[in-house]
């Protein structure tokens, strides 16, 4: 696990984009993408770039259960607004949060991941150490699954909604086992509120109580953090 410290989120996005360009030069064709505030500066760099992404496939980590793609709180909407509208891809995959059978939807998504192995996976990290929507206690062997969101996650995400009552209580998330199959993982974290999770992820122990700690076992992880998020690493 390599740690890169940056001044701020803008610099972090630039470095993540440089890593992406290197990966593309080596033949990467499938990107695993994340939502939330952490990757926004990275997507801004992609949008500003003259690079053409129309031969690439993207697979997103997760989607809320119960939100239509037209809801401005859905992750499908987030990705279109922050990246896909400006930079079309060959194909974009996100879980269908309105699927009538969400367990079957999770299995369908696993098949998509199997058919499109992820070359470059972008991650954020939750205050409780979750990656994707894999909450503490999630099995490291889990693939795509339906998640009951913890109160801490609902509270953290409530800033994107009118009220905390509007935050969906479930999501469909790529599993930890699926994430670990990615060839390369770039995790971005900014702000003091991420410091505890970053410390636990880097120094262990490796435990399902802190899902991101499993990344210690991956062969190619780069963690991009500002000084606040890295404040407990010294």
Curated annotation (Swiss-Prot):
Its EC number is 3.5.99.6. It catalyses: alpha-D-glucosamine 6-phosphate + H2O = beta-D-fructose 6-phosphate + NH4(+). Pathway: Amino-sugar metabolism; N-acetylneuraminate degradation; D-fructose 6-phosphate from N-acetylneuraminate: step 5/5. GO terms for biological process: carbohydrate metabolic process; glucosamine catabolic process; N-acetylglucosamine catabolic process; N-acetylneuraminate catabolic process. GO terms for molecular function: glucosamine-6-phosphate deaminase activity; identical protein binding. The keyword Transmembrane does not apply. Keywords: Carbohydrate metabolism, Hydrolase. InterPro entries: Glc/Gal-6P_isomerase, Glucosamine6P_isomerase, Glucosamine6P_isomerase_CS, NagB/RpiA_transferase-like. It holds the Pfam family Glucosamine_iso. The active site is at 62 (proton acceptor), 128 (for ring-opening step), 130 (proton acceptor), 135 (for ring-opening step). One of its GO terms (cellular component) is cytoplasm. Belongs to the glucosamine/galactosamine-6-phosphate isomerase family. NagB subfamily. Catalyzes the reversible isomerization-deamination of glucosamine 6-phosphate (GlcN6P) to form fructose 6-phosphate (Fru6P) and ammonium ion. This is Glucosamine-6-phosphate deaminase. It comes from Streptococcus pyogenes serotype M3 (strain ATCC BAA-595 / MGAS315). The gene is nagB.
């Amino acid at each position: 696990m390599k740690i890169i410290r940056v001044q701020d989120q803008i610099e972090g996005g630039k470095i993540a984009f440089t890593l992406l360009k290197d990966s593309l030069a080596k033949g990467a064709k499938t990107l695993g993408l994340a939502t939330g505030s952490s990757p926004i500066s990275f997507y801004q760099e992609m949008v500003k770039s003259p690079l053409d992404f129309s031969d690439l496939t993207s697979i997103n980590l997760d989607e809320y259960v119960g939100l239509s793609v037209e809801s401005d709180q859905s992750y499908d909407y987030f990705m279109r607004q922050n990246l896909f509208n400006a930079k079309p891809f060959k194909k974009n995959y996100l879980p269908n949060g309105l699927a009538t059978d969400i367990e079957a939807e999770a299995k369908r998504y696993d098949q998509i991941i199997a058919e499109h192995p992820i070359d470059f996976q972008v991650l954020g990290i939750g205050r409780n150490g979750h990656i994707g929507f894999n909450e503490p206690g999630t099995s490291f062997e889990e693939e795509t699954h339906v998640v009951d969101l913890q109160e801490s996650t609902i509270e953290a995400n409530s800033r994107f909604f009118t009220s905390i009552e509007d935050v969906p209580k479930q999501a469909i998330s790529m599993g930890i086992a699926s994430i670990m199959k990615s060839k390369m993982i770039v995790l971005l974290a900014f702000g003091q509120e991420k410091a505890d999770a970053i410390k636990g992820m880097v120094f262990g122990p490796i435990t399902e109580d802190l899902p991101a700690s499993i990344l210690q076992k991956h062969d190619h992880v780069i963690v991009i953090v500002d000084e606040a998020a890295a404040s407990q690493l010294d």
